[in-house]
């Protein structure tokens, strides 16, 4: 039996591979059974932090409600495009299309804004959040726009909208059932 003497990571790989094989053969019940096994095994290996994420999101929502809009004139600063959405919703495609423009720098999935926000909170607000963020971007040309599709930018959307004058937020949305199935079938490296 191929499953004997395998560690959890190897079992996850086997279950996902089996699921894909059964799916290609049109044997959807067997495919689903292996998907359930793979995802259950992944939950054993990587505990869900959903409660922590929900709590953090709620706290940041309250912070954004209390955050004053930055009305300073920042014409000399670049446009920051934040792309938010669930994994497997099309955000990578959107970022790729936007980044075809030579005046757009693709930052990928970096948490520069979260780091800037933490620094802003620790500095007791002596420095402007948008200035901290733009310094971390290290963009010297104000005509260069940036895209950032870090998975957790949605938590900061309210603060981004108020703190970064030249920010644009693009919410990528896909049918939730399609999205859930796509995430469930995807074998991400972690989590």
Q: PLM ranges: what are they?
A:
Residues 1-140:
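Alpha-helical solenoid repeat scaffolds of the TPR/TPR-like class and their adjacent stem/linker regions
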């Amino acid at each position: 039996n191929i499953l004997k003497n395998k560690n959890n990571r190897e079992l996850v790989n086997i279950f996902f591979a089996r699921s894909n094989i059964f799916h290609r053969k049109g044997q959807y019940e067997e495919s689903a059974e292996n998907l359930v096994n793979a995802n259950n095994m992944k939950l054993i290996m990587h505990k869900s932090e959903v409660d922590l994420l929900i709590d953090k999101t709620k706290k940041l929502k309250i912070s954004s409600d209390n955050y004053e809009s930055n009305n300073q004139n920042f014409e000399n600063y670049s446009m920051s495009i934040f792309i938010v959405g669930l994994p497997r919703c099309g955000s990578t495609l959107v970022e790729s299309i936007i980044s075809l423009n030579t005046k757009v720098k693709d930052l990928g999935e970096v948490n520069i804004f979260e780091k800037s926000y933490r620094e802003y909170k620790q500095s007791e607000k002596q420095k402007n959040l948008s200035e901290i963020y733009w310094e971390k971007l290290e963009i010297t040309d104000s005509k260069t726009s940036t895209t950032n599709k870090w998975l957790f930018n949605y938590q900061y959307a309210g603060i981004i909208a108020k703190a970064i004058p030249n920010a644009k937020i693009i919410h990528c949305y896909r049918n939730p059932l399609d999205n859930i199935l796509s995430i469930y079938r995807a074998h991400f490296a972690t989590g």
